[in-house]
């Protein structure tokens, strides 16, 4: 969970603000943790993982790139663009993608410091992930980070 807190956790409890800024402080990006035994939502407020779906769903994250299936953990960054208003509005989707990019940067920096291997990726089976993670229409998987060890 330390990695999740660094990615998008609350670092100013008095205001509820996070380690990654977001447009209008809407905090639209949620971090999902995909492990071999299940997929979890990172609850920033309580600094804990909540089980969303049992089973190994790393195939959905892999999106055809087999190396991702062997990563011990993958982080999926989901923007709930409804927090900006109209979820169908292109500008809101672009802002959600930007916010996910900021969280992605935090993950990359944390992993570099912790000597973990990661790569930000846009490739994934978003349709399958939406089912597995039980996402609403306005929740869009934007990026993912397989995390592992250097060979």
Spell out what each predicted region is.
Residues 134-151:
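A glycine-rich helix N-cap at a beta->alpha junction
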Residues 9-11, 38-39, 80-84, 126, ...:
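Solvent-exposed loop/turn segments at secondary-structure junctions
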Residues 4-71:
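N-terminal amphipathic, basic helical "cap/leader" segment at the start of enzyme domains
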Residues 3-5, 31, 73-77, 81-83, ...:
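Small-aliphatic-rich amphipathic alpha-helix that forms the alpha element of a beta-alpha
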Residues 54-57, 127-132:
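A short, hydrophobic/aromatic-rich structural module that often spans a beta strand
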Residues 23, 118-121, 137:
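Short, surface-exposed helix-loop/turn micro-motifs enriched in polar/charged residues
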Residues 28, 72-74, 142-144:
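A residue-level signal for beta-strand positions that form part of recognition/binding surfaces
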